Structures are given as structure tokens and as C-alpha cells.
């Protein structure tokens, strides 16, 4: 089981954590949402819970709850700039289909 980050994603997360002034790492999860069923959740975590799995890649700790891990195993988190837009992009090998707007997915 693994979650990885691109160099640009790791750099951006480290900038956010430094600006925030505290934090253990980044929580990655999924929630029920959208027309395809699931959406990604990204948030800072100050203290992982006992049932969490913690991955570390490029100096960034990524925390995933047990329920989300089955849907996220093998995912790479990237940070991309496309024109004037920038943001995190998920490359998840478990995704079978995405909605047209790209906001939700199905595994």
C-alpha cells in the first residue's frame, strides 16, 4: 500500500505547512459526493488518529484513514499549473470512471 507525491506536490505542501506554522502533515481521504459517487478530501492534520495509516514521501507525511485507504492505494498526488489555474491533481489507479466536470469519481 502506498501514497506518493510528485516533487511539485511535496514542495507545495511544505510551503502550506510552513505558512500555517504547525501541522503533522496532510490528510488525504474520500467522501461521498457528486454524480459519480466519491470526491477527494485534502486537509491539514495536527495529530494522526490511532486507526490512521501514515505514509511519508519526499519529507511529507500523508495521513489516510482506513476506510479511504482502499480507494486511494497507489495514488500519486501532483501539483500542476495549467494557464492561470493551479492545484492538486490525483492520479488514482483505482478510478474506473469520473464525472464530466472532474469533481467526483467511481471505483
Curated annotation (Swiss-Prot):
Q: Which named protein is this?
A: Iron-binding protein IscA
Complex and partners: Homodimer; may form tetramers and higher multimers.
Record-stated family: Belongs to the HesB/IscA family.
What InterPro entries does the record point to?
Fe-S_cluster_asmbl/transfer, FeS_biogenesis, FeS_cluster_insertion, FeS_cluster_insertion_CS, HesB-like_dom_sf, IscA_proteobacteria
Task: Recall the GO molecular function terms of this protein's record.
Answer: 2 iron, 2 sulfur cluster binding; iron ion binding
Which GO biological process annotations does it have? Answer: iron-sulfur cluster assembly
* Domain of life of the native organism: Bacteria
Recorded hits in PANTHER family, A to Z, give:
IRON-SULFUR CLUSTER ASSEMBLY 1 HOMOLOG, MITOCHONDRIAL, IRON-SULFUR CLUSTER ASSEMBLY PROTEIN
Q: Which UniProt keywords apply?
A: Iron, Metal-binding
Q: Which GO terms describe its cellular component?
A: cytosol
Functional description taken from the UniProt entry: Is able to transfer iron-sulfur clusters to apo-ferredoxin. Multiple cycles of [2Fe2S] cluster formation and transfer are observed, suggesting that IscA acts catalytically. Recruits intracellular free iron so as to provide iron for the assembly of transient iron-sulfur cluster in IscU in the presence of IscS, L-cysteine and the thioredoxin reductase system TrxA/TrxB.
What remark does the entry make about the cofactor?
A: Binds 2 iron ions per dimer. The dimer may bind additional iron ions.
Kindly indicate whether the keyword Ubl conjugation belongs to this entry. no
According to its UniProt record, which cofactors does this protein need? Fe cation
Q: Spell out the PROSITE patterns in the cross-references.
A: HESB
Q: Where does this protein hold Fe cation?
A: 35, 99, 101
Please list the coiled coil stretches: none
